[in-house]
Every structure is written in structure tokens, then in C-alpha cells.
Amino acid sequence: MIDIQGIKEALPHRYPMLLVDRVLEVSEDTIVAIKNVTINEPFFNGHFPQYPVMPGVVIMEALAQTAGVLELSKPENKGKLVFYAGMDKVKFKKQVVPGDQLVMTATFVKRRGTIAVVEAKAEVDGKLAASGTLTFAIGN
């Protein structure tokens, strides 16, 4: 398990863009983390005030950060950054609303040099909310 301090050591993101609250499981190529979604998230001010829904792109960013924690926690990547290089097969299946706990899983399926490909999914109460294939570039 990695707490918020460990997450902040791995990721350069800070409020309001730090979207990983805790890491529950870590293995060589897979990580499981959570994001507790509250009404205080800044994006709810405009998306949508009368019916707050977490934007899909923010869910994908949370998944990317989850993968980033795993990759940037490795000694050889300390101090580096992870940049989006692409997203494929992204699907949104369930709305994420205040009070939900997003359980995010990212599994690295391919690495070549500084490029990595991740299969990622986000679930709420065991139900798929979003999924996709994310491609990253690791840089200084």
C-alpha cells in the first residue's frame, strides 16, 4: 500500500489535479488505487452544477496518474515525468458522482524504450465506469 505521501513523492501533480488518494495493491506491472470523489472537486462547479458528474477525461487522467505512480516509483524513473502519448478504445459505462469511490486498476502490457502501453479500468461498487488503453512517454 502507498499512502498520499508516497503518491506525492512519485507524482508531480498537486491540488486540484492530484487524482489518486491511496494505492491499495502494487505488483511488477499492475497497480490498484482509489480516488474518493467528493462534491468539493473543482470540476463539479461547471460539470454540471445541477447534476454533478465526473468528466470522462478526468477519469482517464486519474487512471493515467495511477499508472504513473507505479512507473515513477521505480528507482530508475525517480525524478522523471510521464506524458500522455495516446488513448485508444476508451469507453465510459457508468457515471461517477459525488460520494463514489473510484477503484482504478492499471496494468502495463508493453514497454519499448521510453514508451509504455497500459490497459486501465475504473470501477465504482464493482461496476465498470471507464476503461481504455493508454500510451505514455517517460521523459526527464
From Swiss-Prot:
It is an enzyme of class 4 (lyase). One of its GO terms (cellular component) is cytoplasm. The active site is at H47. Its EC number is 4.2.1.59. InterPro entries: FabA_FabZ (IPR013114), FabZ (IPR010084), HotDog_dom_sf (IPR029069). GO terms for molecular function: (3R)-hydroxyacyl-[acyl-carrier-protein] dehydratase activity. GO terms for biological process: fatty acid biosynthetic process; lipid A biosynthetic process. Belongs to the thioester dehydratase family. FabZ subfamily. NCBIfam families: fabZ (TIGR01750), PRK00006.1 (NF000582). Involved in unsaturated fatty acids biosynthesis. Catalyzes the dehydration of short chain beta-hydroxyacyl-ACPs and long chain saturated and unsaturated beta-hydroxyacyl-ACPs. This is 3-hydroxyacyl-[acyl-carrier-protein] dehydratase FabZ.
